[in-house]
Amino acid sequence: MKMYQPFALTLTALLLILSLSGCYTVPITGRTSLNLVSEGDEFQLGMQAYSDAKSQAKISSDPVANERVTRIGKKIAQVSHHPEWDWEFTVFDDPETPNAWCLPGGKVAVYSGLFPYAKTDGELATVMAHEISHAIARHGAERMSQQMVQAAGAAVVAETVANEHIETAKVV
């Protein structure tokens, strides 16, 4: 029977501890998920991504579209689980992109390409609320945590395989 390498055992134990300590219950749904990213780190990443998006994309100068998105967004934010977030709403002038998103901390973007599909305030509110719910439920942090665990698992496998090759070479 082969003995596991100390590195692999240590990393596996660390992953187990992180997995158990990183369990997070989504307040809205009660669903438990793995979350190894702090809310502060998540907000910082969100702020940076929002700033990058605003510097790279064309921001709409349409006062009607901007007022509509801000008005609807503020109503959703007020009844969300995080009305205290520093909510910001931006319309990007991109008629080819029917999309919207919300980053941690309440940074919301709507692309002008969504307006032909979300003609009424109710339709636009549905899309915006859906995107906002992803941020409130911390889905981005959950995905990052899963990627961290996968990367650590891959490191364990790579180290174990490398050590087995070294041991095999010693025998030969």
Model regions: which residues?
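A Zn2+-metalloprotease active-site environment signal
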Residues: 4-8, 12, 20-172
